[in-house]
């Protein structure tokens, strides 16, 4: 089976002052603090979370 694509996501803005659902999306992606980078699988669920908090993130494929 082919390896799934991954997306590299970096939190570039702080979560302070954001609404709770946006903080939950960041936690769901595995982001803990500013400048923290994680690799997540390219799934519709992860894409939805990335789109919701795109103003806080830098995304590389």
From Swiss-Prot:
Glycosyltransferase listed as a keyword: no
InterPro entries per record: Ribo_uL30_ferredoxin-like_sf (IPR036919), Ribosomal_uL30_bac-type (IPR005996), Ribosomal_uL30_ferredoxin-like (IPR016082)
Keyword annotations from UniProtKB, A to Z: Ribonucleoprotein, Ribosomal protein
GO terms (BP aspect): translation
Keyword flag Ribonucleoprotein: yes
GO cellular component terms listed in the entry, alphabetical order: cytosolic large ribosomal subunit
GO molecular function, one term: structural constituent of ribosome
HAMAP family: Ribosomal_uL30_B (MF_01371_B)
Entries under NCBIfam families matching the protein: rpmD_bact
Family designation: Belongs to the universal ribosomal protein uL30 family.
UniProt subunit comment: Part of the 50S ribosomal subunit.
Protein name listed in UniProt: Large ribosomal subunit protein uL30
The organism of origin for this protein: Neisseria meningitidis serogroup B (strain ATCC BAA-335 / MC58)
């Amino acid at each position: 089976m082919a390896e799934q694509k991954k997306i590299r996501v970096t939190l570039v803005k702080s979560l302070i002052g954001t609404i709770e659902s946006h903080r939950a999306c960041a936690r769901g992606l595995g982001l803990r603090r500013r400048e923290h980078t994680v690799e997540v699988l390219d799934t519709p669920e992860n894409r939805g979370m990335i789109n919701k908090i795109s103003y806080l993130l830098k995304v590389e494929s």
